[in-house]
Design a protein with these regions (language model features):
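A short, conserved alpha-helix in the catalytic core of glycosyltransferases
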Residues: 17, 23-28, 33-63
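A recurrent flexible, glycine/aromatic-enriched loop bordering the glycosyltransferase active site
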Residues: 2-22, 84
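Non-catalytic, C-terminal membrane-associated alpha-helical segments of glycosyltransferases
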Residues: 101-155
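Active-site donor/metal-binding and catalytic loop motifs
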Residues: 57-80
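A conserved mid-domain beta-alpha-beta active-site/ligand-binding segment of alpha/beta enzyme cores
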Residues: 92-97
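Short glycine/serine- and small hydrophobic-enriched flexible loop segments
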Residues: 46-50, 98-101, 124
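A short acidic, glycine-rich active-site loop
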Residues: 77-90
Length: 155
């Protein structure tokens, strides 16, 4: 779209999100139990379930890093993929499982994301190092998500 045009979105990232305080009062705060990952996505799903619509400004720019560095596989940069620490992968896996359990999260997103999660698990535990640590932390995240664990990781 043209610079400045708006379009509707399913969810937005917290960085650069502008929300009227009245909406925040009605929808509630971000879920701090999710700690690092998916707090924005969860809030957006909750807002949409209450009838709010989300919009983004086309071609707006915001300097923001979503990972340590781009992922390269067989010499090619994978667009939309970034290296993350094994601990960050833990939160990504745990929190997506926590979202799967919430009834206001759209079923279509859950199905699509489960496929994405399987691809991410395979890629980071088989192809992208540190493979063993990545796999271990992601398995712990899946397990803790299934158990309903929230907040920062604790041994």
């Amino acid at each position: 779209g043209q610079r400045g045009e708006t379009a509707e979105a399913d969810f937005l990232i917290t960085s650069g999100m502008l929300v009227p305080t009245g909406v925040f009062d009605r929808v509630g705060p971000f879920d701090e139990g999710l700690f690092i990952d998916s707090t924005d996505r969860e809030w957006c799903f909750r807002a949409r379930s209450m009838g709010y619509r989300l919009f983004f400004v086309a071609r707006a720019s915001l300097a923001h890093e979503l990972g340590d560095r781009p992922v390269r596989l067989f010499g090619r940069v994978l667009r939309g993929w970034a290296h993350h620490s094994p601990q960050r992968l833990y939160y990504m896996m745990r929190n997506r499982v926590l979202l799967y359990r919430r009834n206001y999260v759209p079923l279509g997103w859950k199905c699509h994301d489960a496929i994405r999660a399987a691809g991410k698990f395979f890629a980071f535990s088989v192809l992208i190092g540190p493979r063993l640590a990545n796999g271990r932390w992601m398995l712990m995240g899946l397990w803790d998500g299934r158990r309903g664990k929230t907040g920062p990781f604790a041994n």
